[in-house]
Design a protein with these regions (language model features):
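Bacterial Sec-dependent N-terminal signal peptides
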Residues: 1-26
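Metal-dependent active-site segment of extracytoplasmic phospho-/sulfohydrolases and closely related
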Residues: 318-359
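His/Asp/Glu-rich, glycine-adjacent segments
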Residues: 96-287, 296-303
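Short, structured active-site-proximal loop/turn typified by the sulfatase FGly-forming signature C/S-X-P-X-R
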Residues: 44-91, 147-153
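Active-site-proximal N-terminal segment of extracellular/periplasmic enzymes that hydrolyze or transfer
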Residues: 21-62, 357
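Structural recognition of the beta-strand scaffold that forms the well-ordered cores
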Residues: 30-34, 41, 56, 64-67, ...
């Protein structure tokens, strides 16, 4: 397993982009975008279809195709830790998304903090980086520029916590109950603008929403496999199995939780990032600010449908549009020449080559022969 994981890591690419300028001024805002479980081919395979954010990044930036993390195991926690802390996760003790704690005598989440309290909502779990005695990129910047701000946003708690370093000004993660929350390890109360955002999020309103295709049917048949594919998730569990578009939410499920499994969640987290830029006045003075954005819903969707599915193709088409709008917003509010934007993909727990359930029936038949 280790050799296979290392092989995947070596073949995976990190993509980093920056505004082209031979002598750029010192950036006022550095934005890091991390797409959870984004394989390199999800950029190249749909290259002809991209017209928004990915297109802008590939056309205007520097593209590094032969870089990788020299660590395993490749889960969300270790991957985001490597990005935010710039260190090998295993050496720091981040050996997975969860692990056995000898002192507590139980399995713990990698960002679990029994001494912290949730702020921002009644639901959710308090998370922090308190169990790791080291600093990260955000801390290094703030040690040189004390008035710089470090804000880290993610759907997953470990995404937001690890990207921001040891003590970001504001890490926010989704509580699967309709709110972005944090813990009192970082601050006592959430800023008013975050509370306002949570009130306006209204995740319940997505209950009757349908996920439909953005492009004509023949385009999906050209770039992805057939829509009906054995092993993909079908949310309508009370009906005949049919994992195809349009995709809704089963009436028995909580839309506030399942919002994380839809492309719309990535749109909401970019709206949250825009609110952070506006209300925290990021990139508006001589102190460079850092903004980390983790697209965690992509991991959920790739687990549900697989990277070759029409659903993932459509999810990336939608994300590319959302990113295009976000880049336009940053240009208007910070200035093209005053920010540095880079996109990074991380190896999550594993990358699907195909949906494993599609092999279940042939495997069962082979076993029954024995």
């Amino acid at each position: 397993m280790i050799q296979k994981s290392l092989g995947l890591l070596v073949m995976a690419a990190f993509f980093s982009f920056s505004c082209s300028n031979s002598n750029p001024p010192k950036p006022k805002l550095v934005i890091t975008l991390v797409v959870d479980q984004m394989r390199p081919d999800l950029l190249t395979r749909f290259d002809d279809l991209y017209t928004g954010g990915f297109r802008w990044l590939m056309d205007h930036g520097i593209w590094f195709t032969n870089t990788h993390h020299e660590h395993s195991y490749t889960a969300t926690g270790p991957g985001h830790f490597a990005i935010g802390f710039g260190q090998y996760p295993g050496h720091a003790g981040v050996i997975g998304n969860s692990f056995y704690d000898r002192d507590m005598k139980k399995e713990v989440n990698c960002v679990e903090d029994p001494n912290a309290k949730v702020i921002g909502a009644e639901e959710g779990k308090a998370r922090s980086s308190s169990r790791y005695n080291m600093t990260g990129l955000g801390d290094w910047v703030k040690s040189t520029y004390p008035h710089s701000k470090v804000i880290s946003l993610g759907g997953k708690d470990r995404s937001a916590i690890f990207m921001g370093g040891q003590k970001p000004d504001l890490p926010l993660y989704y509580n699967y109950a309709g709110s972005f929350i944090s813990s009192d390890f970082y601050l006592d109360v959430l800023p008013d603008w975050v509370n306002d955002f949570n009130e306006n999020l209204n995740a319940e309103s997505y209950k009757d929403s349908l996920w439909t295709k953005s492009l004509p049917e023949d385009v999906y048949l050209k770039y992805a496999r057939e829509d009906f594919f054995q092993g993909e998730l079908d949310d309508y569990l009370n009906e005949d199995y049919s994992p195809v578009f349009p995709i809704g939410i089963d009436s028995s499920e909580d839309p506030k939780e399942f919002l994380m499994g839809r492309p719309w969640f990535e749109r909401e987290i970019l709206k949250l990032a825009q609110s952070a830029i506006t209300n925290e006045e990021l990139g508006q003075d001589g102190n460079p600010d850092l903004l980390f954005i983790g697209f965690s819903a992509m991991d959920w969707m790739i687990h549900d449908f697989g990277p070759h599915s029409q659903e993932i193709m459509d999810a990336f088409i939608k994300l590319e549009k959302y990113l295009g709008n976000f880049i336009e917003f940053v240009d208007e509010n910070v200035g093209l020449e005053m920010y540095y934007l880079h996109l990074r993909e991380i190896m999550a727990d594993y990358h699907f080559l195909n949906m494993w359930l599609s092999r279940a029936e042939p495997l069962a038949a082979s076993i029954n022969i024995i």
